[in-house]
């Protein structure tokens, strides 16, 4: 069972998933946080301040780093996330494969899996979350994005050996507020 930590923001949740620790331990407690060393607010997702070292901010070994001592590890996500501060803080370890769209990432993931007998893969889909934040979780756009994700996952899992374990999770839920 996976239990969401509080707060259920993308930064806090991805860091908890990546480290196995609650936000109070790994230090990535929200979208924007105060960096006491600089006495300024820094963004934990995409716009880290150059004065903040992601490995110092979140110094604990990640699940991916620990697993890579025993088997191949690959992260599949958008190209811009390959060496992002968020990745270096919370999801570092192993190799990276990328694709600009859902279907391109499915192909990249399938290729990475075909090259190894056993592996741990972290596969990130951001499109559904992005669409929900922009249009709302009850919108036709969100429904279309969910259908596209479902289709991609069906294509991806159809290629997997029958003894493959696939875990699907989200970094947070979504409720329309306006």
Where are these regions (language model features)?
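A long, amphipathic alpha-helix that forms part
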Residues: 128-166
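Intrinsic structural disorder
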Residues: 1-2, 178
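Histidine-centered active-site microenvironments of extracellular/periplasmic hydrolases
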Residues: 172-178
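Hydrophobic/aromatic residues located in beta-strands of well-ordered beta-sheets
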Residues: 73, 166-168
């Amino acid at each position: 069972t996976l239990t969401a930590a509080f707060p259920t923001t993308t930064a806090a949740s991805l860091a908890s998933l990546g480290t196995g620790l609650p936000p109070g331990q790994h230090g990535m407690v929200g979208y924007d946080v105060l960096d006491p060393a600089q006495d300024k607010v820094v963004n934990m997702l995409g716009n880290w301040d150059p004065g903040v070292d992601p490995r110092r901010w979140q110094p604990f070994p990640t699940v991916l780093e620990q697993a890579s001592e025993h088997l191949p590890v690959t992260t599949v996500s958008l190209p811009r996330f390959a060496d992002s501060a968020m990745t270096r803080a919370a999801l570092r370890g192993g190799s990276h494969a990328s694709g600009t769209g859902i279907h391109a990432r499915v192909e990249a993931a399938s290729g990475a899996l075909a090259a190894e007998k056993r592996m741990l893969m972290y596969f990130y889909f951001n499109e559904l979350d992005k669409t929900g934040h922009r249009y709302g979780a009850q919108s036709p756009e969100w429904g279309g994005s969910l259908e596209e994700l479902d289709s991609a996952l069906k294509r991806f899992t159809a290629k997997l050996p029958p003894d493959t374990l696939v875990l699907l999770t989200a970094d947070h839920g979504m409720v329309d507020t306006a």
